[in-house]
UniProtKB/Swiss-Prot annotation:
Keyword Endoplasmic reticulum set for record: no
Assembly notes: Interacts (via N-terminus) with protein A26.
Name of the protein in its database record: A-type inclusion protein A25 homolog
Predominant location category: virion
Function (record text): Structural protein that forms a matrix surrounding the mature virion (MV) through interaction with protein A26. Presence of protein A25 in the virion structurally prevents direct virus-cell fusion mechanism.
Coiled-coil regions, chain positions: 420-522, 548-692
Any matching Pfam family: Pox_A_type_inc
Cellular component, GO annotation: virion component
Amino acid sequence: MEVTNLIEKCTKHSKDFATEVEKLWNDELSSESCLSRKTRNVIRNILRDITKSLTTDKKSKCFRILERSTINGEQIKDVYKTIFNNGVDAESRINTTGKYVLFTVMTYAAAELRLIKSDEIFALLSRFFNMICDIHKKYGCGNMFVGIPAALIVLLEIDHINKLFSVFSTRYDAKAYLYTEYFLFLNINHYLLSGSDLFINVAYGAVSFSSPISVPDYIMEALTFKACDHIMKSGDLIYIYAFTKKVKDLFNTKSDSIYQYVRLHEMSYDGVSEDTDDDDEVFAILNLSIDSSVDRYRNRVLLLTPEVASLRKEYSEAEPDYKYLMDEEVPAYDKHLPKPITNTGIEEPHATGGDKEDQPIKVVHPPNNDKDDAIKSYNPLEDPNYVPTITRTAIGIADYQLVINKLIEWLDKCEEECGNGGEFKTELEEAKRKLTELNAELSDKLSKIRTLERDSVYKTERIDRLTKEIKELRDIQNGTDDGSDSSEIDKKTIRELKESLDREREMRSELEKELDTIRDGKVDGSCQGRLELSRMWLKQRDDDLRAEIDKRRNVEWELSKLRRDIKECDKYKEELDKAKTTISNYVSRISTLESEIAKYQQDRDTLSAVRGELEEERRRVRDLESRLDECTHNQKDTQEVDALRSRISELENKLTDCIESGGGNLTEISRLQSRILDLERQLNDCRHNNKTNTETDRNETS
């Protein structure tokens, strides 16, 4: 049964694919080329079928069905061979959107079917992506993207993924933005997943994929996952949202579409939406439980790819936004629950005029013998198959806490960038205060909503129980209507039950009105009304932030200009510092030379003095030598003089002794004195002769 169903799906999806390619066959590739959501879903459907077929005994049949599908009257396999031509000058032949889609899908499909070794897959994809880069370089089609299916990704090692990433990261002229982001995501995801216990796992058939961060729709499409696949998450991840469908297009300059999403409360889901082939199917995972610094895909314009190419942004261009507030939360799809009753002859309440809530719902039943049963009011509360559908506008009230936290985070960041003394400090503090008050008010309203919803569930169960009892009593009444007393008792019991049921309905109606007051803002002062005001206030803050961003960009441009000037000034300052250093070195060398010169000059003066002293010493030496010669020459006279001096001294001593003793006569004394005088005369003559001889020798020497 499964194989038959798969073959039927593959046949339909192959036909849809061929039709889509044929429609795009003549759309020339350019910088504005991009794939619509419908085209991306068609590609995903056929690749999913081929992936599923790998686990069956018909694994090649889906691919054969695809190959035999026709484009412009020619089988796809023949068209593919023509445009591929063994890879020779492929960029010249693959010049339209249709040819691009056919080329990429057929390459992936053939690789899924025929290759199982990672090295073989890597070799094929390396050649393939170099051809893709050549195509993107030739036509500048940066928004074109058909990523690798999960069936091939799970067979590749991280080294292979990094090498494939380098093919795009090194080809700067290729303009393959989305391919670069795709492999960057796989790289980041691998290393974050290996170091964390947090994960969100998506699986179908034989393939599965896990990630701890938000996963954009174009990556889910490339991996061929859908919202109907099995989803499992770790218990620590609380704020996880799965986007499932595009509700409508806005076609404005700010946002392209509004989407439906499901909040993942449980740890495991067997799909959160029904498996359909709708053109508006979407699948993306928003993870608000992980640190925003490691999750680069949280921004809505990056998570949900706009249909209009001009609205698409790269990571560096994306600005903070609150566009998630426009999206609608829906309950998770459960295939075990009955579907809401639609298109079963029930007239729309507003079709008959009057207030939508006050109009009774009419339902046409097949005619029978009872004229009262021909047309009667339809009450959903009496229908056991009725499942109420609650439509919530924007993020559920409990999730506004996330928006508030994010706003506070941005305000803190803005405060840090503006500085403590900035002109917006007062406005930032006021905004934080209002957010704090709004947070407290939302907590109170949330508590009240939970209480009312709990009471509503209790009342609903009681109404169902009473309805069941009334039905049983009616059956009893129809079977025992014989006018007996028991019939009267039953009728009385029925009336009492009806009255009790009416009271319960009134109470339920009041509860529903109260819930409407809080959810839909039907009266002034309701929580939804306040949320609408809060949303308007957030939009104003969004506009203010955008204005501040524009101002900041202008300031950053001025700062960039100043930085360039400062950089030039720094360059000149560096050169000036070098010149100053050189001058200082020269001044130091000059000072050293001057010191050395002064030292040399001082040494020269000292040398001159020494030379003078030396000359004086030499003169004295010569004089001493002369005197020595004189002394040597007059040594005999000197000895004679010394003898005379000795004799005179002796005589003087005798004379003195004689005088002191009073001995001798005057004659002897006179004689001695005369002798002394004679000796002194001789001594003087000797001195005179010595002096004369010395002068004579000097004159002769001269």
